[in-house]
Regions:
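Aromatic-lined substrate-binding rim segments of carbohydrate-active enzymes
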Residues: 69-138, 210-226
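Active-site groove signature of glycoside hydrolases
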Residues: 120-124, 132-201, 222-234
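Surface-exposed, glycine/proline- and aromatic-rich loop segments on solvent-exposed faces
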Residues: 434-568, 623, 627-651
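Short, well-ordered beta-strand segments enriched in hydrophobic/aromatic residues
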Residues: 424, 451-459, 605-613
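Active-site-adjacent substrate/metal-binding segments within catalytic domains
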Residues: 14-107
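A solvent-exposed, charged loop/short amphipathic helix patch at secondary-structure junctions
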Residues: 125-128, 177-205, 286-301, 336-342
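Glycoside hydrolase catalytic-domain groove-lining segments
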Residues: 243-244, 248-338
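Aromatic-rich peripheral "rim/lid" segments of glycoside hydrolase catalytic domains that contact
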Residues: 339, 344-348, 359-433, 675, ...
Length: 688
């Protein structure tokens, strides 16, 4: 008896005692729409407006499932109040999520819908996880040997599950291997519910088999079907670029939902799912001649006015099935990733999201999900990942990481309120925070999960005067001079407050993190062949590497001939962004003039400053580790410090410096939630 119980609830083993029972479909993919059968049995169109959610909270990795039942219930309430009607989860969640989803929907007049995703890398893993997921949404799954112990999935949320999305962001190399080097993969498939089209790739054949198996399993065990599709994105979509452009864009595989054909038995139908992000401007000009000819009727009057330069219109026209955007987003982080894309405030983030969501609907897509619901601290961005401890970045908020700022909800430092609000008000400061006093000017210091806060107070502290503040972070390098100033200690940074538009943080050239990591990719010169002196005296701008958006015309390839690879590499090198430039503004969310990117603000005879930890080369501020010497360690390694030093000068001469004690907070992460300005902008367009 126990063995049967285990097999039934844990291993997806079942006996079909109702082989002749009808299979129903409450949700269908019909034409270009998703429909939902109402209480009168009528299929009505359903336009999905939602957010992507993952179980991410500060102090935990996503797979730790740090969010609990109360968190999910609160978030679902916020999402419902925003005007959304759906949630997309890219993978199986924890029992608390499904219990919260069930509880919310059974106690609210307007339930939320769920688009459920699953991830896997091959046929076997996808087949297994899809069966598990199907049992979970029907409340018929117990995982006896999960990483967190036993997991009970007993809440039946299947009435609100719109469909399934197979896969995450597929690795193009995996697709290539399966298409060309995996002899075990069949090159065609004819199933009960799905078949592969003539000319389908082996990877598409694998997906047809997976989708067929999942539909068969739910049809036989639960007597229900629902739409199913697989995830794609601009790097792996069906578009084929001419070789010269494909090389630059690194686009060498294609996945086409049209190559997976539903049978008449698949009553629920299929859909195309895309994660949207900027890929390249004028992409239609880079297509192969054959594809340009095949798509000519679509391309002729393509609407290029939207956010993705015609991509939305192209996909809507091309596909014979509903199209859903499972994720699109814009970061409100302090630092960008690409040329010509400066950082966005929360308001600008909301305006970009609202504009894109509206355009997606106007072009006839069946749904759009904003990615993501909450900021995700454990995410790392390519141009800053090298600079922090890869095992502990969930314990602090890296304002310099764009990927951490995509949410509509922020996690703010402090259990209830921020320790410091950058607004020119001294209410959060007292003598306990005083760290330095010189020539009538006082420096106060505090820190949080986000960065170091300073208040400079005294006569002459105003936008008209220039203040120089040397900061000594590491004992391993630095300089004691700058122009006519002589610092008491070898300093690694120089904070120059020079009005509202020219204030900035400079770094000692030897301690410039981006130089040692990306200089070769920017200039072709290995920085370790041009090592700055140990006690380098030059301060330089703090830069951040950016991706180039330049696409070299195919004609240039022919002109350059055999040398094209190196020449093109030269033209497409990484660019740089002066991330040390500070933004003047009010950083108090309660202010009508709130600027989420604000770094400093002048008050009466004072200025408040926020310096993000990574801007000061902290490797892990939770335990107060800073970067060690790059050229002695051959890269970034952490070294603990118990204090850093700071001083101030208005005029030439010697600059005494005093310590700022540092203790860190370890794993004790205290945060509170805050709905961003972008949330309320989305609420305005979705609540109509």
């Amino acid at each position: 008896m126990l063995g049967a119980f285990y097999a039934h609830f844990s291993r997806s083993v079942f006996i079909d005692f109702r082989p002749n029972a009808p299979v129903t479909a409450v949700f269908r993919a019909e034409g270009d729409a998703i429909t939902h059968q109402n209480s009168d049995g009528i299929d009505v169109p359903l336009v999905l407006r939602g957010v992507e959610m993952i179980p991410s909270v500060p102090g935990n990795m996503a797979w730790d499932f740090g969010a609990d039942l109360d968190d999910y219930l609160r978030w679902l309430g916020y999402i419902d109040a925003m005007g959304a009607n759906a949630i997309y989860v890219p993978n199986i969640m924890d029992p608390d999520f499904y219990n919260a989803f069930y509880q919310f929907n059974t106690t609210n007049e307007n339930p939320l819908f769920l688009l459920q995703g699953v991830d896997g890398h091959d046929y076997d893993s996808l087949t297994s996880v899809l069966r598990e997921m199907i049992d979970i949404i029907h409340g018929r799954r117990i995982n006896f040997f999960s990483r967190t112990g036993m997991e009970f999935f007993l809440s039946d949320i299947s009435p609100w599950v719109v469909g399934f999305v197979v896969g995450a962001d597929w690795d193009p190399d995996t697709i290539t291997f399966m298409n060309h080097f995996d002899p075990a993969m069949p090159d065609s498939f004819q199933g009960e519910f799905f078949s592969s089209a003539e000319g389908a790739s082996r990877f598409e054949v694998m997906l047809a088999r997976v989708m067929d198996g999942a539909t068969a399993y739910e049809s036989r065990r639960y007597k229900v079907q629902r739409p199913i599709g697989f995830l794609s994105n601009p790097t792996i979509d069906f578009l084929e670029y001419a070789p010269a452009y494909a090389t630059q864009l690194r686009k060498y595989v294609q996945l086409n939902p049209e190559n997976i054909i539903p049978s008449e038995s698949m009553d629920a139908g299929t859909f195309a799912a895309y994660r949207l992000f900027y890929f390249t401007d004028d992409f239609t000009n880079y297509l192969t001649p054959g594809q340009q000819e095949a798509l000519a009727p679509i391309l002729e009057d393509l609407d290029r006015s939207c956010m993705y330069n015609g991509y939305l219109d192209l996909l809507a026209r091309y596909h014979s099935m509903p199209v859903i955007a499972t994720g699109f987003g814009f970061s409100s982080g302090r630092a960008p990733q690409r040329m010509d894309e400066p950082p966005l405030t929360e308001r600008e983030q909301g305006e970009a999201l609202a504009g894109t969501a509206t355009q997606i609907e106007e072009r006839g897509w069946a749904g759009a999900f904003i990615s993501t619901w909450q900021d995700t601290w454990e995410r790392r961005t390519w141009n800053t990942a090298f600079s922090s401890d890869p095992w502990r970045y969930q314990y602090w908020h890296n304002l310099q990481s764009a990927d951490q700022g995509y949410g509509l909800m922020a996690f703010e430092p402090g259990a209830d309120v921020r320790p410091v609000l950058i607004d020119g008000n001294a209410d959060e400061w007292n003598d306990y925070h005083l760290v330095h006093e010189y020539d009538g000017i006082r420096i106060y210091a505090q820190y949080s999960l986000q960065g170091l806060y300073l208040m400079i107070r005294g006569e002459g502290v105003n936008p008209e005067n220039t203040l120089y503040l040397p900061i000594d972070v590491t004992p391993r390098s630095g300089t004691s001079v700058f122009e006519n100033l002589a610092f008491e200690r070898h300093s690694d940074f120089l904070l120059i407050l020079s009005g509202e538009d020219e204030s900035r943080l400079l770094v000692n050239r030897r301690y410039h993190a981006t130089y040692q990591r990306f200089y070769e990719e920017m200039t072709g010169i290995n920085p370790f062949t041009r090592i700055p002196p140990k006690w380098e005296s030059e301060f330089v701008p703090i830069t951040l590497a950016l991706q180039s958006t330049l696409i070299v015309d195919a004609d240039i390839f022919e002109y350059l001939g055999p040398a094209f690879a190196e020449e093109v590499r030269e033209m497409r090198r990484l660019r740089s962004w002066d991330t040390g430039m500070l933004t003047h503004g009010i950083g108090n969310p309660a202010s009508p003039y709130f600027n989420s990117l604000a770094d400093f603000y002048f008050g009466e005879n004072l200025v408040e400053i926020r310096l993000p930890w990574m801007l000061l080369n902290f490797f892990d501020p939770s335990i107060m580790q800073v970067h060690d010497d790059y050229y002695e360690r051959f890269g970034v390694e952490g070294i603990r410090v118990q204090e850093i030093y700071i001083g101030i000068a208005i005029e030439d001469g010697g600059v005494p410096m005093s310590p700022i004690p540092l203790r860190g907070w370890g794993n004790n992460v205290q945060v509170h939630e805050r709905l961003k300005q972008s949330y309320f902008i989305i609420q305005e367009i979705w609540s109509d």
